[in-house]
Swiss-Prot record:
Biased composition (Polar residues): 333-345
PROSITE patterns: SH3B
Provenance organism: Bacillus subtilis (strain 168)
GO aspect biological process, one term: cell wall organization
Catalytic reactions of this protein: Hydrolyzes the link between N-acetylmuramoyl residues and L-amino acid residues in certain cell-wall glycopeptides
Residue intervals of the MurNAc-LAA domain: 346-514
Residue ranges the record marks as coiled coil: none
Name this polypeptide is given: Putative N-acetylmuramoyl-L-alanine amidase YrvJ
Length: 518
């Protein structure tokens, strides 16, 4: 009998010793990335449990286990705690480690500041010098969280390049410059020099007004320049160029007394009258120039190549007449209040993503890939018009509905636009539909935007309707959800995927937002 009791006690001790080991082995289930500004960590899976810690946006913690809408995480202190699942982004541990090992950025700014959060309002915690490399931890709407010299912080994505360091000279070596160079003078207060001929390229340095430089080559509205031994690319319409020595460039530039309007953003609308509701006569490309023949409020009257008169908003052009009058960026020399989108915070929400493919089109294409295409094009146009734009997902990742709404609240959005495409079992169904939830808060936004889109769209108008969608119902900010066509309809699927349609609907949404904010 005593021997049996002894064996039983040994078994109990052995089993007890196994439990912690078993728990730690099965614990790893990826990482939780905090998706809201601040979040409470609780001692158990529910709001009734006590708060034990607080975590901040962008921080990462190993996931231990899940219980309904709650996730248990491993804190850095060795403690464990529970957080709500809809305020985190889950990342697979394998993909996180593989991307982390190769995803690096290089600073292109000699004085790039690291901040405690993704925005200029956050505290400066250090510097990321030009040429230095760092590992990427997270990304958020134009900001990148990096690990640099054992410190972590956020830097603006505008001043870093992906991967190893590259310089403008590396880029320029691949360009065949013409033998005949010209001299030029910077005609704006601050001119970005970029690593390649693109507005998406990294900024290498900035040049002040009046800086003399050599123009080596020009292509597609960009000038390949050299200044003080540094080579790079600048938008050519910001330069006053001449084949005479640089000292005489101001005189050469003043030979034309007619004041010109230089288009700063691709796809700028030229209208029949001085109003965003006026019909569009023509769309101008970035760098196009027109003679200014008059003004009307905050609009310039311009003369088109065919002799016709049109109007362009003065906040989307640069004007120049001589070196002394080379136009400032429009925000700085436009009167206060010009441009209804200026400084408006707009959330662009591409529906679905990651494991959520959305609907599947007639040809088998996923909705999630089309929504982000539309969202990125729209965001680019809204930024060009002066808006502060945040996109809820930048790539093919899953973002919860709660996180999308949380972004709207956190950014105190002036407007939230959720982009979707529709489908139906009856493949003859087609058309675009704008949805709102609150008549008082949302309906005007949906109506203004939809009215401008249908002017440009070639597909049927299904109207502005009430929609009980989470991103509308739970959103405290003005919000709309846009179904921009039926991908279950074979012809309409081809239409909505076309570049022409994408340009038209994003133009319409931009114009509708301008109308809404007037």
């Amino acid at each position: 009998m005593n021997k049996k009791y002894f064996v039983l006690i040994v078994c109990i001790i052995f089993t007890s010793a196994l439990f912690p080991t078993f728990s730690s082995v099965t614990a790893a289930q990826g990482e939780a990335v905090i998706a809201t500004d601040e979040m409470n960590v609780r001692s158990g899976p529910g709001l009734s449990y006590g708060i034990t810690a607080e975590v901040k946006k962008g921080e990462r913690y190993p996931i231990l286990k899940e219980d309904g809408d709650w996730v248990q995480i491993q804190l850095g202190s060795g403690e464990k705690g529970w957080v709500v699942s809809w305020l985190i982004t889950k990342e697979d541990q394998a993909s996180t480690s593989s991307s982390g090992s190769s995803d690096t950025v290089t600073s292109t700014d000699p004085d790039l500041r690291m901040r405690s959060g993704p925005g200029t309002s956050y505290e400066v915690i250090g510097k990321f010098p030009q040429g230095s490399q760092a590992s990427v931890i997270d990304k958020d709407s134009g900001w990148i969280k990096i690990s640099y010299h054992s410190a972590t912080g956020w830097v603006s994505s505008e001043y870093v390049t992906s991967g190893g360091s590259s310089s403008a000279s590396d880029e320029s070596d691949q360009t065949e410059d013409s033998g005949a160079s010209t001299t030029g003078t910077v005609g704006v207060s601050s001119l970005n020099v970029r690593a390649s001929a693109s507005h998406d390229a990294a900024i290498i340095t900035k040049l002040d007004r009046g800086t003399k430089l050599t123009v080596l080559n020009e292509k597609n509205g960009w000038a390949h320049i050299e200044v003080n031994g540094l080579k790079g690319w600048v938008a050519s319409h910001y330069l006053l160029t001449s084949s005479v020595p640089a000292d005489d460039s101001a005189n050469a530039g003043s030979s034309s007394s007619a004041k010109k309007a230089y288009i700063m953003y691709g796809g700028t609308n030229l209208r029949s009258d001085a109003s965003t509701s006026a019909s569009i006569v023509e769309r101008a490309a970035k760098g196009d120039s027109y003679t200014i023949t008059g003004s009307k409020g905050s609009w310039y009257e311009i003369k088109l190549d065919n002799g016709q008169t049109a109007y362009v908003a003065n906040w989307v052009v640069q004007t120049s007449k001589s070196a002394e009058e080379a136009g400032e960026p429009p925000v700085s020399d436009s009167p206060s209040g010009n441009g209804s989108l200026n400084n408006k915070t707009i959330i662009v929400d591409p529906g679905h993503g990651g494991k959520d493919s959305g609907t599947i089109g007639y040809s088998g294409k996923f909705e999630k890939n089309l929504t982000i295409k539309t969202a990125k094009l729209l965001a680019s146009k809204l930024r060009s018009a002066g808006a502060d734009v945040y996109v809820t997902r930048q790539d093919d990742t899953f973002v919860s509905l709660q996180s999308r709404v949380s972004t709207s609240h956190y950014r105190n959005a002036d407007a939230f636009i959720s982009i979707h495409y529709d489908s139906y079992a009856d493949t003859s169904t087609r058309g675009s539909t704008a949805y709102y939830y609150s008549p008082a808060k949302d309906q005007e936004l949906a109506s203004d935007v939809h009215s401008e889109v249908v002017k440009r769209s070639s597909i049927p108008d299904r109207g502005v309707l009430f929609g009980d969608y989470y991103v509308l119902r739970e959103n405290r900010q003005p919000a709309m959800l846009y179904e921009l066509g039926y991908v279950s309809h074979p012809q309409e699927e081809a239409i909505v995927h076309s570049n022409s349609y994408q340009e038209k609907v994003t133009d319409g949404i931009e114009s509708g937002l301008e109308k809404y904010f007037q």
